Amino acid sequence: MSKLSRRQQEILDYIKEEVRAKGYPPSVREIGEAVGLASSSTVHGHLSRLEKKGYIRRDPTKPRAIEVLDLENLASETTEAKATYIPVVGKVTAGLPITAVENVEEYFPLPEQLTANDNTYALRIQGDSMIEAGIFDGDLVIVRQQQTADNGDIIVAMTEEDEATVKRFFREKDYIRLQPENSTMEPIILTTCTILGKVIGVFRTIH
């Protein structure tokens, strides 16, 4: 393997430490904070060079997944269940793929059996519009990317104002109704919307 720069070695060592401690690799943001890099694009650049030099592998079918290739010594130190790392989307930008680098804050491990395909991502909920469906502010919803939905499905949709929202979907005769699960809120009525995926699960950290 090619020799690493000091910064690349710091990043690789940090990834290994996190895998030892947690059983899964750190987010790009966490890597930047650990080694003193404020720019996520700079971190991505170092990760690309580590990959080219053969130290890590990033699976393009599983966005943001990082696999350290010299983990023989770590294998006996972690009891990690086999997991798929899905991107956590902090925002949705019109015109960009939902899992574009610009949208992704970190990644999150899920058991492989919960991800039927590679088109799964997580979205952090902001607000209380879905509380009566058991989805609360700060929760992560697990979303399967798809462009269609049945009436009653909870979906991630892009509205006509290019804003992403999580609501229950209903196609009425002359319009689309995005229904909040909060009796104090009114539905969103649209002539059209772009469906970005169906919510298939919720993850919440109990403090």
UniProtKB/Swiss-Prot annotation:
Job of this protein: Represses a number of genes involved in the response to DNA damage (SOS response), including recA and lexA. In the presence of single-stranded DNA, RecA interacts with LexA causing an autocatalytic cleavage which disrupts the DNA-binding part of LexA, leading to derepression of the SOS regulon and eventually DNA repair.
Site for Cleavage, residues: A94, G95
Ranges annotated as DNA-binding: 28-48
Keyword Cell membrane: no
Catalytic activity, as annotated: Hydrolysis of Ala-|-Gly bond in repressor LexA
Organism: Halalkalibacterium halodurans (strain ATCC BAA-125 / DSM 18197 / FERM 7344 / JCM 9153 / C-125)
Pfam families listed in its UniProt record: LexA_DNA_bind (PF01726), Peptidase_S24 (PF00717)
InterPro entries referenced in this protein's UniProt entry, alphabetically: ArsR-like_HTH, LexA, LexA-like, LexA/Signal_pep-like_sf, LexA_DNA-bd_dom, LexA_repressor, Peptidase_S24_LexA, Peptidase_S24_S26A/B/C
This enzyme's EC code(s): 3.4.21.88
Molecular function as annotated in GO: DNA binding; serine-type endopeptidase activity
GO biological process: DNA repair; DNA replication; negative regulation of DNA-templated transcription; proteolysis; SOS response
Active site: S129, K167
Protein's UniProt name: LexA repressor
Keywords in alphabetical order: Autocatalytic cleavage, DNA damage, DNA repair, DNA replication, DNA-binding, Hydrolase, Repressor, SOS response, Transcription, Transcription regulation
Signal peptide extent: none
Subunit structure: Homodimer.
Family: Belongs to the peptidase S24 family.
Lineage: Bacteria, Bacillati, Bacillota, Bacilli, Bacillales
